[in-house]
């Protein structure tokens, strides 16, 4: 008797009467050598309602010798799964709906034609963002591995994609959590009768501080600044103590304590795996929607709110003729849904094999897009109120972009409305919970990837590995906690992570659709869901989605953003530095390709064939066990 690898996922047979199938905790199909007599019946595939041929049939038939084998793990070795389906959905929604939905989408929408922007945004979502989102969920759920080891089952030569994703995740964690630290500082500062950014009588204020909402007659000059702006720049960031990237200054101990608290919450939320993080997101993923609803109702009742809504949605159809509008729409939907970061692969890998990931992709994508749209009303009703109070045009009030829109403009509006303390507390608490969800997801993507790749080292030491990851991210964040840390945050966001993750996602889409094969991928989906993806999805995966990513990358390279923060213009060398940081992650892909081709024995043609052929079987469920099949 001998065992041989499975030639097909369909060639599964049961051991005769279940005898001698178990060895060292693993079920094995005994395959006879030539001359042995074989009697076997096929078994149910375990996920289809239709029984396989021979299932439940007493008829026995012979099969060719040495054609099939079975290696199935016992049920107790099963991969961890989500406690409930809703845990997975809330985790994915919490990951996709982040701070960018609140500040980036509203700003980009009004800047690119208001209501007219929804047309390119919807088109890019349908043909680019959602197909990539669906692809990653299906890949993760079928192969049940993180972003590194999954490539052994798809196309081994592209394993460098997984390492690149892990490095990108580290860069993101280095600056993203700093924004949460700012929000936490604001939250702590909000527990006062009078919010500290409402007046110019504080120690950090300058002679240029001018309060728009003061009862005194005021004169606004070119150099005038609001109390909210000075609180953000001079008290929270202390950016006046830095001369720029060439001299960042010291570390703000207040922000360092805030980020330590943030990382502590993160650690105890994810240290035990998806069983614990899946429960935490019941709070962190739902709380923002409660607060958004409260803020929406409050904003709609403010005087002048209609001015903000009109400014937000009034369509400028001429904008649709500008290429930049379509670029912004494509970039926004991609970074909002978040394919290419390894998170969707990790989350989906903990699903049950026959979970309807197609439905999940559609539901979570729609929820994400609708959240962005509704967030625009939350922001612009308040901006309309500010414009009414200042007797200015909304465009003058809404000139701030990025974090400044939240920490200066919106914070100032909250400070000058009734019950300001209450609304400030819930608003900044909402920002923190939005950020926590995304950080949980980003780090889980890395943790799952490393644990799956090195199970013999870390499988029983997850808590220690998570601690090491969190500590590493904390030390990586120190440069963003300096007095000039805001300059670093903007540089990392614009240059170090954006282009890199776009390129990684493009190569991933090509590797799956062209090398692994769209036909094989669709077969995998059919085995899970019972139906094959239609032609729309196939065309998107093979051509439209890769072109969608290539379009964004080329547009970025042809017209890179000019960096400016407050009154500081970034030096030219900083752009080169940003590209170098981004390249440091992407370089993992060609480096691993070269390593693979050099280390694989055989002729050059044989090396290529071996390198693009899956080398590890994928487990297929069969009743109470999982079957390994090639």
Swiss-Prot record:
Phosphorylation at Thr-276 increases 5-HT uptake and is required for cGMP-mediated SERT regulation. It is found in: Cell membrane; Endomembrane system; Endosome membrane; Synapse. Its main location: membrane. It comes from the Eukaryota. The chain crosses the membrane at residues 88-112, 116-135, 161-186, 253-271, 278-297, 325-347, 361-380, 422-443, 464-483, 495-516, 539-558, 575-595. Pfam families: 5HT_transport_N, SNF. Disulfide bonds join 200-209. Residues 31-59 are annotated as: Disordered. GO terms for cellular component: endomembrane system; endosome membrane; focal adhesion; membrane raft; neuron projection; plasma membrane; presynapse; synapse. Serotonin binds at residues 98, 439, 494-495, 556, 559. The keyword Transport applies. Na(+) 2 binds at residues 96, 98, 101, 336, 368. Glycans are attached at residues 208, 217. SUPFAM superfamilies: SNF-like. Residues 1-87, 136-160, 272-277, 348-360, 444-463, 517-538, 596-630 are cytoplasmic. It catalyses: serotonin(out) + K(+)(in) + Na(+)(out) + H(+)(in) = serotonin(in) + K(+)(out) + Na(+)(in) + H(+)(out). The modification Phosphothreonine is found at residue 276. Residues 616-624 are annotated as: Interaction with RAB4A. Residues 113-115, 187-252, 298-324, 381-421, 484-494, 559-574 are extracellular. This protein is the target of psychomotor stimulants such as amphetamines or cocaine. This is Sodium-dependent serotonin transporter. It comes from Macaca mulatta (Rhesus macaque). The gene is SLC6A4.
């Amino acid at each position: 008797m001998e065992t041989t690898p499975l030639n097909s996922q369909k060639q599964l047979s049961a051991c005769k009467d279940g005898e001698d199938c178990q060895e060292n905790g693993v079920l094995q199909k005994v395959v006879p050598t030539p001359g042995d007599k074989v009697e076997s019946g096929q078994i149910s595939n375990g996920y289809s309602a239709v029984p396989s041929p021979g299932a439940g049939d007493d008829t026995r038939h012979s099969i060719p010798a040495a054609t099939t084998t079975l290696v199935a793990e016992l049920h107790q070795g099963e991969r961890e799964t989500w406690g409930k389906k809703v845990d997975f959905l809330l985790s994915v929604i919490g990951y996709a709906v982040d701070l960018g939905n609140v500040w980036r989408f509203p700003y980009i929408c009004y800047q690119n034609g208001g209501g007219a922007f929804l047309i390119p945004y919807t088109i890019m979502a349908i043909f680019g963002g959602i197909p990539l989102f669906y692809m990653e969920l299906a890949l993760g759920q079928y192969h049940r591995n993180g972003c590194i080891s999954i490539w052994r089952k798809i196309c081994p030569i592209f394993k460098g994609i997984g390492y690149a994703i892990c490095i990108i995740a580290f860069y993101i964690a280095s600056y993203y959590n700093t924004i949460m630290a700012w929000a936490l500082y604001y939250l702590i500062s909000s527990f006062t009768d009078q919010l500290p950014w409402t007046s110019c009588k504080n120690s950090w204020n300058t002679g240029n501080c001018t309060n728009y909402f003061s009862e005194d007659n005021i004169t606004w000059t070119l150099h005038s600044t609001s109390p909210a702006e000075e609180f953000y720049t001079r008290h929270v960031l202390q950016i006046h103590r830095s001369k720029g990237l060439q001299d960042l200054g010291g570390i703000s101990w207040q922000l360092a304590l805030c980020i330590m608290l943030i990382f502590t919450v993160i650690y105890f939320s994810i240290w035990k795996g998806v069983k614990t993080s899946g429960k935490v997101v019941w709070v962190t993923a739902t709380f923002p929607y409660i607060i958004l609803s409260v803020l929406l109702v409050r904003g709609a009742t403010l005087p002048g709110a209609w001015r903000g809504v009109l400014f937000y949605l009034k369509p400028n159809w001429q904008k649709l003729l500008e290429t930049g509008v379509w670029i912004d729409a494509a970039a926004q939907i991609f970074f909002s849904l978040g394919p290419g970061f390894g998170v969707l692969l990790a989350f989906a890998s903990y699903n049950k094999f026959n979970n309807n990931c197609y439905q999940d992709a559609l539901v979570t994508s729609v929820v994400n897009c609708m959240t962005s749209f509704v967030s625009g009303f939350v922001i612009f009703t308040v901006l309309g109120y500010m414009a009414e109070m200042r007797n200015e045009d909304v465009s003058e009030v809404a000139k701030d972009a990025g974090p400044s829109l939240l920490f200066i403009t919106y914070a100032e509006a909250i400070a000058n409305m009734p019950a300001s303390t209450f609304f400030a507390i819930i608003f900044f608490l909402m920002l923190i919970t939005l950020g926590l969800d995304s950080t949980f997801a980003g780090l889980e993507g890395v943790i799952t990837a490393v644990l799956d790749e090195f199970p013999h080292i870390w499988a029983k030491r997850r808590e220690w590995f998570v601690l090491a990851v969190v500590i590493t991210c904390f030390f990586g964040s120190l440069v963003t906690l300096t007095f000039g840390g805001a300059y670093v945050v903007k540089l990392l966001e614009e240059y170090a992570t954006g282009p890199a993750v776009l390129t990684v996602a493009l190569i991933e889409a090509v590797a799956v659709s062209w090398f692994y094969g769209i036909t094989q991928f669709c077969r995998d989906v059919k085995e899970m869901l019972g139906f094959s993806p239609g032609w729309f999805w196939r065309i998107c995966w093979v051509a439209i989605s890769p072109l969608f990513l290539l379009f964004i990358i080329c547009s970025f390279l042809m017209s890179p953003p000019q960096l400016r923060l407050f009154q500081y213009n970034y030096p030219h060398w900083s752009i080169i530095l940003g590209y170098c940081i981004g390249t440091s992650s992407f370089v993992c892909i060609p480096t691993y390709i070269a390593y693979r081709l050099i280390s694989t024995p055989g002729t050059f043609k044989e090396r290529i064939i071996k390198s693009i052929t899956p080398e590890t079987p994928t487990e297929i469920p069969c009743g109470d066990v999982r079957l390994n099949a090639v």
